[in-house]
């Protein structure tokens, strides 16, 4: 938790960016994984609640009165029976003091606060809920059915929160760098131990263990697989085979809940084949191009599209694509190989603020999301600003089901050499991902050390440990 003045200043700035009414920011509750009171999923506080209050205990709600410039922390103290099982914890008033608030109230009083605002014609602002218990809580407090809450959420509050959270301060960048340091250890450990005969699940479990031992936990479900063509393939009992590529997409969350997110693809046996190098070098070139051009004022959408053009040109050199590059990209033919966006924002969420709505977080009045397959998965397209933290993550994938589907429909046959693509159906996929900070005149890697990604560096690093 940062110094309480940080949270006081953030809440004051939030009030200034709002017109009037009452802001209600819901913290998260514990969530049982199989039955109540035993066996909970790991607790994770809501990120916007964390940003403005910094408190990691479950069952809390923050109330900010815009008009009267007052603040209150709502929550119930635990009783002696809970203390027996879980130990002593800070009281609600103690936690309020830690975040610079003096007024507290039990949860039963929250409805009266909301009713008073409503009865005096003042708007109750809340963010879009994403957990069922918060949706039920909002229904009980405001009478809004869960199916209508996304539309009823305060757009004014959404935009105000995004405007504050999207540009990271120096103290936030320092925390992200700490998460990146853990991420470096996770990925280099995966490279060090990967070899034929191990299972994906074994290596993935070791990667997760590194996150838990050095930080809070992993920032999302770790992807470790030799089937890199599956975008979000969880580790399974597949046995790693010599000649295949292992894809590791993993990140850490540090004790302040800031995230890292990296992807590396490397040969199971430590040596790339020529065929693998040809595809890998294209992804590497796309990754490095984005690093060269990312800077304040540049549309991230344009960077993404130029990466698609570069990838198409190089796939044409291998004979996998053909025809006019611009026509192929405009038609979306490249998306058979790259069906996702170039990158996303990152911070307290690995996909930062995604619950607030893609149209507000990654896009704006200037540019809105595409509806075209592949490009519609781009999570951010707006102009970069100094202080943005982005991921740079191009990839090339050979997805058998997608290849068969498009070929059966005759899609983009003027741009895709299906006969040659057929010979790559057992190739898998390659993705390279790094976390970058948009600086005053460009961008830089986050973290003190860069996880090896140039082919010779990858092979040399793995050779030291095989």
Language-model features and meaning:
Residues 1-466:
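Active-site neighborhoods and metal-handling regions in enzymes and metal-associated proteins
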